[in-house]
Amino acid sequence: MASSLRAAISKIKRDDVGQQVCPNYVMLRSSVTTKVVRNVVEYQIRTGGFFSCLAMLRPLQYAKRERLLGQRNLERISTRDILQTRDLHSLCMPTPDAPMSNHQAATMRELICSYFKVDHTDGLKYIPMDERYSPSSLARLFTMGMAGLHITTEPSYKRVPIMHLAADLDCMTLALPYMITLDGDTVVPVAPTLSAEQLLDDGLKGLACMDISYGCEVDASNRSAGDQSMDSSRCINELYCEETAEAICVLKTCLVLNCMQFKLEMDDLAHNATELDKIQMMIPFSERVFRMASSFATIDAQCFRFCVMMKDKNLKIDMRETMRLWTRSALDDSVVTSSLSISLDRGRWVAADATDARLLVFPIRV
């Protein structure tokens, strides 16, 4: 992994708008193209294979990756076989996958310092004032991205979206990950939504305002997706205790911050609607939306379970079997093209891969 990653990093180049490009490393953007038709913005996002990069989540590989990038020494992590609380803090740190502007860095830092009552020195630990860094870190993939999201057409390993995220353009309202049921062709939510303020007022002390669930396999052991979904939600909640509270709250915090950043970016689009046909405005916005759109990568239920399981609560993960499922995927080294359409009208947002609709997101007000 270390040698292949080093080879991938050596291939990094910059495209015509100064963004880092590496076709074989999914954490580095490949390309984004934009088309504006009336008030609908359509994005074509091409990324490398996702599954081959999940191996980096293993502490040993993650430590190698961090040392290779010269960010910090994580040798102690490599001696353990499960992620600890402080590892989640590392996962939430920005990574140099897509640069952000100083204005974006300052905005994110202000959000952190204001809402979580920390001084600017601590804020610098999370959002460095450096254009090499981006809020699009592993945390974004494992918060927004773990919300179900894609149904893959791979017949040997299908997933169902059992929850979704939405951010209303008119108010700071989040539809957090929640389980859904299908009534014919209609997606019916089975849990309420909460505002970001309500989440942050929770004091980050637990799951009182947030019930975490995640995706599941279809027809695993001949059990319905709904039954698996309920079991998944229970598993996460059972992980909560005094020892795991901080780590779970880190995930919760990142979810709130990612959604708040998404809201700011959507506001920026709404306030500049009359300028959408000007390519000068669309280029920088495309880069920001790419970081949000990367959350639509296919993700695995076992991956999230692995991330949040700080202590062994008799929920054992067969990592050998898990990695076998990941590595056998035909998507390992292929280029995946996804589409994201955002309309300024009231209605639904659709994320699709090729011609198949994979996720329907409905802007909601509480």
From Swiss-Prot:
Keywords: Host cytoplasm, RNA-binding
Transmembrane segments: none
Cell location: Host cytoplasm
A molecular-function term among this protein's GO annotations: RNA-directed RNA polymerase activity
GO cellular component: a single term: host cell cytoplasm
Domain of life: Viruses
Region (Important for ssRNA-binding and formation of complexes): 1-11
Main location (coarse class): host cell
Note: There is a strain variablity in the inhibition of the host integrated stress response (ISR). There is a correlation with the abilities of the strains to prevent upstream PKR activation and EIF2S1/eIF2-alpha phosphorylation.
Stated role: Protein that binds to ssRNA and participates with protein mu-NS in forming the matrix of viral factories, which are large inclusions in the host cytoplasm where replication intermediates are assembled and viral RNA replication takes place. Plays a role in the inhibition of the integrated stress response (ISR) to escape from host cell translational shutoff. Participates in the disruption of stress granules (SG) through its association with host G3BP1 and mu-NS.
Self-association and partners: Homooligomer; in presence of RNA. Interacts with protein mu-NS; this interaction allows the localization of sigma-NS to the viral factories. Interacts with host G3BP1 (via C-terminus); this interaction induces the relocalization of G3BP1 and other SG proteins to the viral factories periphery.
Protein name as annotated: Protein sigma-NS
Organism: Reovirus type 1 (strain Lang) (T1L)
